[in-house]
Curated annotation (Swiss-Prot):
This is Toxin ICK-21. Residues 1-20 form the signal peptide. GO terms for molecular function: ion channel regulator activity; toxin activity. Disulfide bonds join 43-57, 50-61, 56-78, 68-74. Glycans are attached at residue 71. It comes from the Eukaryota.
């Protein structure tokens, strides 16, 4: 019984580690989810990255908090 408890603890720790690593990944593109959304929702939902300069510079997507690939700000890229 103790063996199962230890395995369960290891699984929980592994899941927590993967989720913590996933927080860093959110800063970059998550194309699987974002491409499934309508364009306007995709722009609003993706606060940390954009697929290309055209999308970053579009009126819908050019929020000050939004950063483009390589962490360029939209203002810097679109200027």
């Amino acid at each position: 019984m103790m063996k199962y408890f230890l395995v369960l603890c290891l699984v929980v720790l592994a899941v927590a580690a993967v989720q913590a690593a996933g927080l860093e990944e959110e800063k970059f593109l998550n194309l699987g989810e974002s491409l499934a959304m309508p364009e306007e929702s995709r722009c609003k939902a993706r606060r940390y990255g954009c697929t290309d300069k055209a999308e970053c510079c579009s009126e819908k997507c050019a929020y000050p908090a939004l950063t483009c690939v390589f962490n360029w700000s939209c203002e810097k890229v679109c200027a």
